[in-house]
């Protein structure tokens, strides 16, 4: 169960966006930090933290000399040190991807559950929730998979959410509900998603 092309593109776009814009993100409560000096201090501090996390993430992910056990330990340390940041979520998504490629869905579920608690971004949360729901579906956790999809927000995810919902409903034996879900995907999806939904409708 590989990541879809759309998910890969969205994750890579988010990574690039954070590298370019993360250090200039303005948080509303910072307006009360204490005048211009406080703002400048906070902005400099945040920029340094984000730049450091970005560099550490690149080093961690691109390391080819470490064995898997050592790399896993380093990723756990990185996530703990960079808790609640996008880079912690990216690291956990990478781990979940490797686990699914090995069909170790239990490990993938653990990584994605952790990523979901770390994410502070709606788009990133939606991507993680889609992946987690798909993994729970693979594990036969059908009710959990449907529940997880409630955390997927935004119109751009509607078709993928509807297709996965339909797959789960088919597995639960509810073909009427599945038909409605696949038809919804046909109305809101890209050309590829529409074709996928049509194929699933034909197979009902």
Swiss-Prot record:
Residues 1-23 are cytoplasmic. It is found in: Cell inner membrane. Its main location: membrane. The chain crosses the membrane at residues 24-42. GO terms for molecular function: protein-containing complex binding. It is a single-pass type II membrane protein. Residues 43-204 are periplasmic. InterPro entries: SecYEG/CpoB_TPR (IPR018704), TPR-like_helical_dom_sf (IPR011990), YfgM (IPR026039). GO terms for cellular component: plasma membrane. The keyword Cell inner membrane applies. Keywords: Cell inner membrane, Cell membrane, Chaperone, Membrane, Transmembrane, Transmembrane helix. May mediate protein transfer from the SecYEG translocon to the periplasmic chaperone network via its periplasmic C-terminal region. Interacts with the SecYEG translocon. Forms a complex with PpiD. PANTHER family: ANCILLARY SECYEG TRANSLOCON SUBUNIT (PTHR38035:SF1), UPF0070 PROTEIN YFGM (PTHR38035). This is Ancillary SecYEG translocon subunit.
């Amino acid at each position: 169960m590989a990541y879809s092309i759309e998910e890969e593109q969205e994750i890579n776009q988010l990574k690039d966006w954070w590298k370019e814009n993360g250090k200039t993100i303005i948080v509303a409560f910072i307006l009360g930090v204490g005048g211009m000096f406080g703002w400048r201090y906070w902005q400099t501090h945040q920029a340094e933290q984000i730049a450091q996390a970005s560099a550490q993430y690149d080093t961690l992910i691109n390391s080819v000399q470490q064995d898997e056990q050592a790399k896993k330990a380093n990723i756990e340390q990185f996530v703990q040190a960079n808790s609640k940041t996008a880079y912690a979520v990216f690291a956990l998504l990478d781990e979940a991807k490797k686990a699914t490629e090995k069909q170790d869905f239990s490990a993938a579920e653990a990584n994605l559950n952790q990523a979901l608690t770390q994410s502070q971004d709606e788009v990133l949360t939606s991507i993680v929730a889609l992946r987690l729901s798909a993994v729970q579906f693979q594990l036969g956790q059908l009710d959990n998979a449907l529940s997880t999809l409630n955390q997927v927000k935004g119109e751009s995810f509607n078709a993928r959410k509807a297709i996965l919902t339909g797959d789960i409903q088919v597995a639960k034996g509810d073909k009427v509900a599945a038909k409605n879900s696949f038809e919804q995907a046909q109305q809101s999806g890209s050309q590829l998603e529409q074709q996928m939904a049509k194929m699933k409708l034909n197979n009902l």
